[in-house]
A protein has these predicted regions:
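Detector for outer-membrane/organellar transmembrane beta-barrel domains
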Residues: 217, 245-355
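Sequence/structural signature of outer-membrane beta-barrel proteins
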Residues: 47-53, 90-92, 139-150, 182-193, ...
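Intrinsic disorder/low-complexity segments
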Residues: 11-14, 23, 216, 288
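Bacterial N-terminal signal peptides that target proteins for export
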Residues: 2-10
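Secondary-structure junction/capping motif
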Residues: 27-30, 202, 271
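A generic structural micro-feature
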Residues: 61, 156, 200, 234, ...
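Surface-exposed coil loops of outer-membrane beta-barrel proteins
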Residues: 95-120, 129-233, 238, 300-335
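Beta-barrel outer-membrane channel/assembly domains of diderm bacteria
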Residues: 2, 14-16, 20-139, 162-172, ...
Length: 406
């Protein structure tokens, strides 16, 4: 009860002070224009997903539709609001497993369960000195490696939180501060999850990201994530890190280092490190990149985790490493991306191994093509193939997606 009172007191206090921004309609000049100048958007995303995983006796064939309506008020004296509702429905037979449909073990998992939910609902304020938002919202930090929205799945991950963004002037360079207090994490598993995955993390967490540019084209970010989950204490951790992104001529550079340890009621006592380095080069419209990413292990007992990340974006689209193996993981990867006419193409190759010991986990090949039919409609084909060695099982995944926005 005390925890609930704290949540809503923080929400009420922030609304009274002010809060932050995303989708905005026109500026209102009177209170009545908050509604008359509001904006409504619709988004529909159809997806067919095929999964052939050697550990399951049957192949998954999932046909789903996400329908989204987003209403945003006009801004009045810096204040505005937003409400966004999503529905996910399967089309045809339910020949796949979700955490809630009782078919795990028969079919591979396709984490797009049916359901209707409020995806976002918040009050925001944007002023000259700061922006802030209170309510259910997206929080996407940097490349979403540590805090993200998992926008790839039909049901998005959003956060019940109070968020404040502050620009701070210093004698050297402006610094941007982004702080969030998070009391619930609304995960991708839908409103009716009754399987092994909780639909939300009950949270008492803090997320802080600060960035500055020491020179044009170069950015340094500092971050701290204190994650405390009542119903998933094994994911409770404290993480501190630094990242750099920049370019020298046609060469792009990215690097991150972080350290993590157990926090609050986590039953595991551990310390682990994270490292990432990537070099890219662009020539005649083709982007090339090579990188190394390590999620370290503490003597093979437990490894570095990022439970709030957009995990599908990293370590292969076959999603074999959503939870880091106890021996950790090293990923050496290569990327080629470009365009053929209006179509965007990208290919990835990953070579996975353990951080602790000498296990060869396997390799993965990924390819995607996206074609814009017009400004409102796009189609995408995407494929992932994971070839297992010492970890998991051979898996093929294929997706066909149609995205429509109005």
């Amino acid at each position: 009860m005390k925890r609930q009172t704290l949540k809503y007191s923080a929400l009420a206090a922030c609304i009274g002070l002010s809060p932050f921004s995303a989708l905005i309609a026109d500026e209102a000049t009177s209170f009545s224009e908050i509604l008359t100048k509001s904006d409504t958007k619709f988004n529909f995303r159809y997806r067919y997903e095929y999964v052939d995983d050697d550990k399951s006796p049957k192949e998954a064939n999932a046909s789903t539709l996400k329908s989204r309506i987003t209403w945003s008020s006009a801004s009045y004296k810096g204040f505005s609001g937003l409400v966004e509702v999503d529905n996910v429905s399967h089309i045809g037979g339910e020949n796949y497993a979700t955490p809630s449909n009782g078919k795990a073990g028969e079919y591979p998992i396709v984490a797009d369960p049916d359901g209707t939910d409020i995806n976002q609902i918040y009050l925001k304020y944007k002023g000259d000195s700061f922006t802030g938002i209170a309510g259910r919202q997206r929080i996407l930090h940097s490349g979403q490696r540590f805090v993200g929205g998992v926008g790839w799945r039909q049901n998005e991950q959003t956060y019940d939180s109070v968020r404040v963004q502050l620009p701070i002037s210093t004698a050297i360079t402006p610094v941007k501060i982004d702080y969030s207090y998070i009391w619930d994490v609304n995960r991708i598993f839908g409103p009716d999850t009754n399987g092994g995955q909780p639909r939300r993390y009950e949270s008492d967490s803090h997320a802080l990201y600060a960035s500055f540019s020491p020179a044009e084209g170069h950015t340094i970010g500092l971050f701290s994530y204190l994650l405390d989950f009542d119903n998933a204490s094994v994911n409770s951790s404290e993480t501190y890190g630094i990242e750099y992104k920049g370019a020298i001529g046609p060469v792009s550079i990215a690097a991150t280092a972080a350290t993590q340890s157990d926090y609050k009621e986590n039953p595991v006592d551990y310390d682990a490190e994270y490292y990432m380095a990537e070099l890219g080069y662009k020539i005649k419209g083709v982007a090339l990149a090579a990188g190394y990413e390590q999620l370290g292990s503490d003597d093979g007992e437990f490894a570095f985790r990022t439970p709030l990340a957009t995990l599908h974006k990293f370590q292969g689209w076959a999603d074999k490493f959503l939870v880091t193996p106890a021996d950790g993981i090293e990923d050496i990867y290569f990327k080629v991306a470009g365009k053929v006419g209006p179509a965007k193409l990208a290919m990835f190759y990953h070579d996975f191994s353990s951080d602790e010991g000498s296990d060869d986990y396997g390799t993965e090949f990924d390819v995607v093509a996206t074609y814009p039919v017009n400004k409102n409609v796009s189609v995408q084909m995407k494929y992932a193939r994971y070839d297992a060695e010492d970890f998991s099982t051979d898996t093929d995944k294929l997706w066909f997606t149609i995205n429509m926005k109005f």
